[in-house]
Design a protein with these regions (language model features):
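Phosphate/diphosphate ligand-binding glycine-rich loop within oxidoreductases
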Residues: 44-116
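N-terminal glycine-/charge-rich "phosphate-binding" loop or analogous flexible N-terminal tail
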Residues: 1-43
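Oxidoreductase and adenylate-handling cofactor-binding alpha/beta cores
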Residues: 101-117, 141-145, 276-284
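NAD(P)-binding Rossmann-fold cofactor-contacting core
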Residues: 143-161
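Phosphate-coordination loops involved in phosphoryl transfer and adenosine-cofactor binding
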Residues: 3, 120-123, 209
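Rossmann-like dinucleotide-binding domain for NAD(H)/NADP(H)
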Residues: 209-364
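Rossmann-like adenosine-cofactor binding region
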Residues: 54, 156-250
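Glycine-rich adenosine-cofactor-binding loop
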Residues: 10, 93, 101, 120-141
Length: 364
């Protein structure tokens, strides 16, 4: 069988080793994956992460017929263009759900500890009940916390929400909850677009001393509205995604309880999961079988087994800090906030490109 020519982002771990005997794999830095590069290497398949914009500029006049991203989100795909060209496209839903859930848990534990909040006084609001939202709810259900959920598309599908969550409208989430986390995709069309979903009108409903966690996509929250609210209200924020990435709002970062450069989903475990989903999509589409042995061995090496319990929250907070090093990322973010726009952008791209291996702690 003729070997398939695959161009892959070298940031997808083990993809070369798993495909080398059944395809011609060319690894490249995301910034080098260009139209001319794809043409030069006669690429038929493309495996990337969210740092590569997949559109007409990238793919016109190439032989690419398959694109897979090792990330859960795919707002870096021009879906209309791909559909018009008949190019198959795949994402990796849920691959980093536990990674992001740990970020949410860490943020809430930090808020509880620094603000001396009692668990019984928390009402948790989850906007978006996909893979991440469901997992966050399952974790906090073990702590017997009141959980409120909003996800209109799921509701329209007559989805049966678990009995440990209360469904309510978006404005009710902001009225009832003192901890809110959003996990929606960034969409600009459809019945429920999420771009600029959370504006000053909603944010003004928040109670003083609330916590807002933003780890979905930049553009879901209107940052200027959020910062203006923070000037007049006591509000804690944990922000991982930014409106103008790779640039970020320095004032907002420095005013936050936690601010990071879009790395909530960057655990090593999550990246391995993303590789697995890309390989499965390649196998199913092309009918070739990758060698999964090395990837399976690596995934088994870093399986997590720690549970979240009321009586071990301090221990969990320490373990998450030791394993995920979010405070190190926050310190680097604050330091980078002193740079000019070009410097901040370079920092943001560099840390995401060369993010160190950080291992997950929790398992539901």
């Amino acid at each position: 069988m003729k070997k398939i020519n695959i161009v892959a982002d070298f940031a997808i771990p083990f993809i070369d080793e798993c495909l080398t005997n059944i395809s011609n794999v060319v690894l490249a830095n995301h910034s080098n994956i260009t139209n001319s590069f794809l043409i030069k290497n006669n690429a038929e398949a493309l495996a990337i992460r969210s740092t590569v914009k997949v559109n007409k500029t990238l793919l016109d006049n190439t032989n690419v017929k398959f694109v897979a991203t090792a990330t859960s989100g795919y707002d870096h795909f021009d879906v209309e263009y791909l559909q018009n060209r008949g190019i198959a496209y795949f994402h990796s839903p849920g691959c980093n759900a536990n990674s992001v859930a740990e970020y949410v848990i860490y943020s809430i534990l930090k808020w509880i500890i620094t603000k001396n909040i009692e668990l019984k006084n928390i009402n948790l609001g989850i906007i978006g009940f996909g893979n991440i939202g469901k997992l966050v709810a399952r974790y906090f259900h073990t702590l017997d916390i009141n959980i409120y959920v909003n996800d209109p598309p799921l509701k329209d599908e007559n989805f049966i929400f678990p009995d440990y969550v209360h469904y309510c409208e978006l404005d009710e989430i902001f009225e009832k909850c003192n901890v809110i986390t959003n996990h929606v995709p960034l969409t600009k069309s459809g019945n429920y677009p999420t771009q600029a979903l959370i504006t000053g009108k909603l944010l003004s409903k928040l109670k003083d001393n609330s916590l807002l966690i933003h780890a979905s996509r930049g553009g879901v929250i209107v940052e200027s509205d959020l910062f203006n609210i923070m000037k007049v209200r006591k509000l804690s924020t944990a922000i991982d995604v930014w409106e103008n990435e790779p640039d970020f709002n320095s004032e907002l970062a420095n005013s936050s309880l936690l601010a990071t450069p879009h790395i909530a989903g960057y655990s090593y475990n999550g990246k391995l999961n993303g590789t697995m989903q890309v390989l499965k999509n390649i196998e199913n589409y092309f009918g070739i079988k990758p060698n999964y042995d090395i990837l399976n061995a690596e995934m088994n090496k870093y399986k997590t087994n720690t549970k979240l319990y009321i009586d071990n929250l301090q221990d969990i907070f320490k373990k998450l800090n030791d394993n995920r090093r979010f405070e190190d990322d926050f310190a680097r973010m604050r330091e980078a906030s002193k740079l000019d726009k070009a410097g901040k952008q370079a920092f943001f791209q560099e840390i995401r490109k060369n993010y160190p291996k950080r291992y997950e702690t929790l398992n539901i």
